Amino acid sequence: MVILLTSSLTSLVRRLQLEKKDFVKYLGVLIDYELSWKNHINLICLKISRTVGILAKLRHSIPLRPLLNIYQALINPYLYYGICAWGSAPKTYLNNLLFIQKRVLRLIYFMDYKQHAVPFFLNSKVFPLSFIYFDCLCSIMWNVANNSAPENIKRAFTRISEVHSYPTRSSLNDDFYTEHSRLEKMRVGPKIWNSLPSDMRNLPKSTFRKKIRNMLFEILSKSDDYLEITEIMHQLN
């Protein structure tokens, strides 16, 4: 399925008169007026840095597996929550989170701070930040394609087949797109979805998620690098 943004969101914002603030907190996410996500990412860094200190002490007294369980329980939730929104932030901010990810895994494995960390991500079955973003966008786009996403999210996208009255390669593949250039950051979801093999997009949700995770770990292993979203998509071709 290929995926298009509708005008309802833009029209709603124009009708509202809002008090300007540097940022607001909504459902646990700090949204700044420039949509840079700097405040929210700084908050995540602060919260997970506390866990890094805990793990640095515990690693001397408990085995590897419980340490990784603590990572999954106390760090991963902050990285996954709302990432479909803030994962489009500038690389300058996102790199701070990736740095903490690498630091904590090196601590868990008792490795030097300069040690290449990709093998630790693979061994721990943990995604670097950009891979988390890719994984979560795949999940939400599956929901959009299968009409199980919330209405306000579904309205942001349009199927190519709903635009063209004649058959196109994209319409036959059930591709999606978004409409407005001002919402360019939201285009990454359809781009990712449209880059996936059609047979994968037609899988049930649980099988689809498993295939995506396996595919991402394979890409991480082959590239041995922290690829950006566009670089991950190129690996699919």
What are these regions (language model features)?
Residues 1-22:
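Short, conserved micro-motifs composed of acidic
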Residues 18-85:
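Basic, alpha-helical interaction scaffolds
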Residues 24, 42, 46-49, 53, ...:
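Amphipathic alpha-helical interface elements that mediate macromolecular binding in regulatory proteins
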Residues 24-34, 48, 75, 79-86, ...:
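Short, conserved catalytic/metal-binding micro-motifs enriched in Asp/Glu and His
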Residues 53-56, 60, 75, 105, ...:
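Hydrophobic alpha-helix feature that most strongly marks membrane-spanning transmembrane helices
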Residues 84, 93-162:
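Short, charged alpha-helical motifs in flexible N/C-terminal segments and linkers
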Residues 151-188:
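Amphipathic alpha-helical
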Residues 211-237:
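C-terminal helix/juxtamembrane-tail motif
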